[in-house]
């Protein structure tokens, strides 16, 4: 039962709080900033093509750095502030670490999944979902869950897309936290998280 309260206390520290809201807004602004660098290309694009190519942009990784900063670096922050001592007096290290792993995953998952989904939906105000004359659309629908796009189920497709991106963010944020147990410098911890992202992408490719 004590473990449940520790997890709950950590959860209430980030869910709906200032850092989470700022992170959500940062994801929206960041993604718009990246795609609007080529304003002419943006106007002539469509949502499906834009999101597909956007993942190849090197600045895409900043999304993962933003979400990892919510709980992925919490150990470093609590060691610096002395809050770690407060926790250890109330639970053992195993429960502390387990709670942080759970919250590192779900904070990053919820933040990036919701942020990306809202960003993609907002693109619909300015862009069409697809270009029927584009050969690239045929390439995209041959990939995972492409049948949803082919049948016009765009919202369903991007719900699953954002769930996948969110899970990747959760895993990387958890990895960032684990690294922070051994590396005390917060900046170095974040850099390691970025390296994990590139290794993950390279492995998947």
Per-segment meaning from a language model:
Residues 18-20, 92-94, 98, 185-190:
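Membrane-helix interface segments
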Residues 28-74, 102-181, 202:
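Secretory targeting signals
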Residues 22-26, 98-99, 107, 111, ...:
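Hydrophobic core positions of alpha-helical segments in small-molecule transporters
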Residues 1-24:
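Aromatic- and glycine-rich beta-strand/loop motifs that create alpha-glucan
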Residues 23-30, 186-200:
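Central hydrophobic cores of alpha-helical transmembrane segments
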Residues 74-107:
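Helix-loop-helix units of permease transmembrane domains in multi-pass membrane transporters
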């Amino acid at each position: 039962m004590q473990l449940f309260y520790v997890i709950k206390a950590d959860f209430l520290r980030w869910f709906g709080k200032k850092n989470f809201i700022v992170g959500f807004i940062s994801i929206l602004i960041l993604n718009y900033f990246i795609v609007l660098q080529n304003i002419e290309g943006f106007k002539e694009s469509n949502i499906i093509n834009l999101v597909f190519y956007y993942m190849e942009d090197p600045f895409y990784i900043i999304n993962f750095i933003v979400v990892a900063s919510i709980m992925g670096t919490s150990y470093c922050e609590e060691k610096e502030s002395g809050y770690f001592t407060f926790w250890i007096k109330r639970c053992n290290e195993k429960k502390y670490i387990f709670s942080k792993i759970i919250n590192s995953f779900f904070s990053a998952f919820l933040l990036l999944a919701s942020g990306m989904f809202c960003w993609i939906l907002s693109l619909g105000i300015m862009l069409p979902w697809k270009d029927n004359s584009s050969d690239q659309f045929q390439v995209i629908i041959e990939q995972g869950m492409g049948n949803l796009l082919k049948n016009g189920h765009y919202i369903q497709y991007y719900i699953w897309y954002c769930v996948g991106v969110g899970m990747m963010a959760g895993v990387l944020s958890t990895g960032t936290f684990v690294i922070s147990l051994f590396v005390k410098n917060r900046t170095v911890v974040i850099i390691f998280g970025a390296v994990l992202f590139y290794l993950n992408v390279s492995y998947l490719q």
